[in-house]
């Protein structure tokens, strides 16, 4: 049975119980004990949770907090795009160079703009999220790392009845859908790891 260490934000925490149940025949899923909000937190988590455990697969579910505006009316982000790309590269290289684990990057899902209270309150927008995701995917491709495109999965399944109360986290049905889609890809990755 393969061992998977997964790090991610609250969105990841929401779908992980279902994901663990779906993978129970193929893999043991261990979720980091606290949500990992930014790429900086992922950097710390690699040393704290991935390297000591040496799982067959290390999954990094990117959170959208990196893309949050830090000042209302300005466009500066909590983690600037160039720093985000560097962090992703460092995270993936640490796993590739200091372990036998297969790293996997999961992109940030889009926000549901119908339910985000106000752009200035949350400071999230899908254009920026998409830009950060493309940067992470380019880094992963350069390093030969698998990507699970949660942004694309959610966009492709967009439905008018899909409700996220504050526009960021998913309801139970949305989390189940995400878990199912991610499980399919993780089974493929585990089979090769």
Which residues are covered by each model-predicted region?
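A short beta-strand-loop structural module common to alpha/beta enzyme folds
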Residues: 26-42
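A short, Lys/Arg-enriched amphipathic alpha-helix followed by its capping loop at the start of a domain
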Residues: 15-27
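Catalytic nucleophile-elbow at a beta strand-turn-alpha helix junction centered on a G-D-S/GDSL motif
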Residues: 1-17, 35-38, 65-67
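Alpha-helical cap/lid subdomain in secreted, periplasmic
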Residues: 22-25, 41-193
């Amino acid at each position: 049975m393969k061992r998977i260490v997964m790090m991610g934000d609250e969105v990841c925490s929401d779908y992980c119980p279902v994901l663990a149940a779906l993978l129970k025949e193929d893999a043991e899923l261990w979720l980091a004990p606290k949500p990992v909000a930014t790429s900086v937190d992922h950097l710390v988590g690699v040393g704290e949770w991935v390297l000591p455990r040496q799982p067959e697969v290390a999954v990094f579910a990117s959170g959208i907090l990196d893309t949050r505006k830090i000042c209302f009316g300005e466009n500066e982000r909590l983690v600037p795009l160039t720093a985000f790309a560097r962090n992703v590269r460092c995270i993936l290289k640490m796993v590739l160079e200091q372990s036998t684990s297969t790293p996997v990057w999961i992109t940030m899902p889009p926000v549901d703009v119908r339910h985000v209270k106000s752009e200035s309150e949350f400071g999230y927008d899908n254009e920026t999220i998409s830009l950060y995701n493309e940067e992470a995917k380019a880094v992963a491709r350069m390093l030969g790392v698998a990507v699970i495109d949660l942004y694309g999965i959610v966009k492709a399944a967009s439905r008018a009845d899909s409700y996220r109360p504050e526009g960021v986290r998913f309801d139970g049905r949305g989390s189940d859908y995400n878990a199912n889609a991610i499980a399919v890809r993780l089974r493929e990755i585990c089979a090769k790891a």
